[in-house]
Each structure stands twice: as structure tokens, then as C-alpha cells.
Amino acid sequence: MWRRIVSSHLKSISAVGSCAAPSCRHAVVESTHLSLSTRASSIPAYSSIFSRLIGSAAADTAVKKRVEDVMPIATGHEKEELQAELEGRKLDDIDFPEGPFGTKEAPAVVKSYYDMRIVGCPGGEGEDEHDVVWFWLEKGKSFECPVCTQYFKLEVVGPGGPPDGHGDDHH
């Protein structure tokens, strides 16, 4: 429930930061607070504290927001998602890669948080489709699908390192 409340109002909070005129900021804050308070009757009492926190925080400053300002109890992946939304990024963009058929000169780029990722190749479109072929895609190496000859390349957009969190040098 918290995620729904936060994600639906992150855009209005970020709009406060992008609005330069004080009157514009006041209007956005008022509309944010109004939309939060109209939902308060359908949300348990503890979330009204949360809505007041968002409304008052947005009214006080139009500076960069931190996740702790919006949702202090967020941790782990949820905190990363909220931080990315506050910065205007979408972490889900790396989950469903789409694009043109990868060639040797221009491989299909797959984004990953780590130096390795499991990828599935469904082939091209129409008659070029095939059963999904699963493989490990590694940083710095391209991979050619053995069925459709599509090429893939990994782009690391996160902290890097192995996906299990353990380095090879700890043995």
C-alpha cells in the first residue's frame, strides 16, 4: 500500500522541484496535499501522517528530495526504485530489453546491474522466432545466439560485480 501511495505522488513532488516560480510551487503543493487528503478517508489513519509529511516537506523546500524524506522506512530494492523515480529514472527499463535485431557490428544491448546476466533469445519476429535460448551474458564479451545468429552485448548500469554478491578473490 505504501508503494502505491508514494509512487502516485512522486511525480507531483518532482514537479515542485522543476517549477521555478513560488506561485507555481504553491499550486503544485496545494494540489498534492489536496489529492492526498481526499484519499485519506479510504486509507488507514497511520498513512495520514505520511501524507502530512509529504505535503509539509514539499511546501518547505523545492530542493532535491531524498528517499528518507518521502518514505523513511524504505530499504533495499524498494529504496533503489524510489530513489531512481525521484531522479527521474525508471529501474524497470532494464527488465524488458527491446530493440532491433542484434548484428555483429551493432549487437543488441542488454542492461544489467552486475557483470553477468541470464538472457533469453526468442529470435526475430514472425517466421524468425524460435524457442527461447537461455545463456549467460558477460561484461566485455558479445554472445551469438546459436539458432538465429543474433548478437548480444552487456551494458553494466549498476554497481557491477558478480550477481551473487561474492567476489572470486574470497576463496
Swiss-Prot record:
One Pfam family matching this protein: COX5B
Record-level Gene Ontology MF annotations: metal ion binding
Compartments, record wording: Mitochondrion inner membrane
A single BP term in Gene Ontology: mitochondrial electron transport, cytochrome c to oxygen
Keywords of this entry: Membrane, Metal-binding, Mitochondrion, Mitochondrion inner membrane, Transit peptide, Zinc
Annotated residues for binding of Zn(2+): C121, C145, C148
Keyword Membrane in annotation: yes
Segment annotated as transit peptide: 1-54
Family, as annotated: Belongs to the cytochrome c oxidase subunit 5B (TC 3.D.4.11) family.
Function: This protein is one of the nuclear-coded polypeptide chains of cytochrome c oxidase, the terminal oxidase in mitochondrial electron transport.
Name under which the protein is recorded: Cytochrome c oxidase subunit 5b-2, mitochondrial
